[in-house]
Amino acid sequence: MLFRGRSHRSLDPKGRLMLPPDFRDILMSRAEGGKLVLTSFDDCVMGYPLPDWEDFERKFSTLKNPSRKMRDFRRLVIGSAELMELDGQGRVRISRSHMDYAGITKDVVLLGQGSRFEIWDQGRFDGIVTQDFDDVAAELADSGIELSL
């Protein structure tokens, strides 16, 4: 099962976010107790089921002689990772540091991204969807992916 779709949500006053039912089901099926890792990157908060995150960390640790930029990336992404667990109501708490990084105040958009999901501030996400994506079709075609909608 993969994370798919978009959902608009609001954080409660304690910074907790109610995940969509299908996201909760995926977390519960892939991680004992619904454990997940939240990290910051790309102007949003990313959520991974714990086993998927651990696999990512293992792969990352096998890099031979990583560049300074790669080490800085690791500092940002792995250094900001926080182990979380869904509460009894299917909520996850978003830390202040993640909220600050992603510009999250209250209203958010959750986006399924396959093996992970992203949590975006509503305003930042609105800026993404208004972009012109005409050049993306050519980039996909260069990668052997035809997007025929």
Curated annotation (Swiss-Prot):
GO molecular function, one term: transcription cis-regulatory region binding
Every SpoVT-AbrB domain range: 6-52, 81-124
CDD domains linked: MraZ_C, MraZ_N
PROSITE patterns found in the cross-reference section: SPOVT_ABRB
UniProt-listed SUPFAM superfamilies: AbrB/MazE/MraZ-like
InterPro entries to which the protein is assigned, alphabetical: MraZ, MraZ_C, MraZ_dom, MraZ_N, MraZ_sf, SpoVT-AbrB_dom, SpoVT-AbrB_sf
GO BP term, pick one: negative regulation of DNA-templated transcription initiation
One GO CC term, this protein: nucleoid
Disulfide bonds: none
Subcellular location: Cytoplasm, Nucleoid
Keyword DNA repair found: no
Keywords: Cytoplasm, DNA-binding, Repeat, Transcription, Transcription regulation
One Pfam family it belongs to: MraZ
Keyword match rRNA-binding: no
Family of this protein: Belongs to the MraZ family.
Database matches in PANTHER family: TRANSCRIPTIONAL REGULATOR MRAZ
Subunit structure: Forms oligomers.
UniProt protein name: Transcriptional regulator MraZ
Organism the protein comes from: Nitratidesulfovibrio vulgaris (strain DSM 19637 / Miyazaki F)
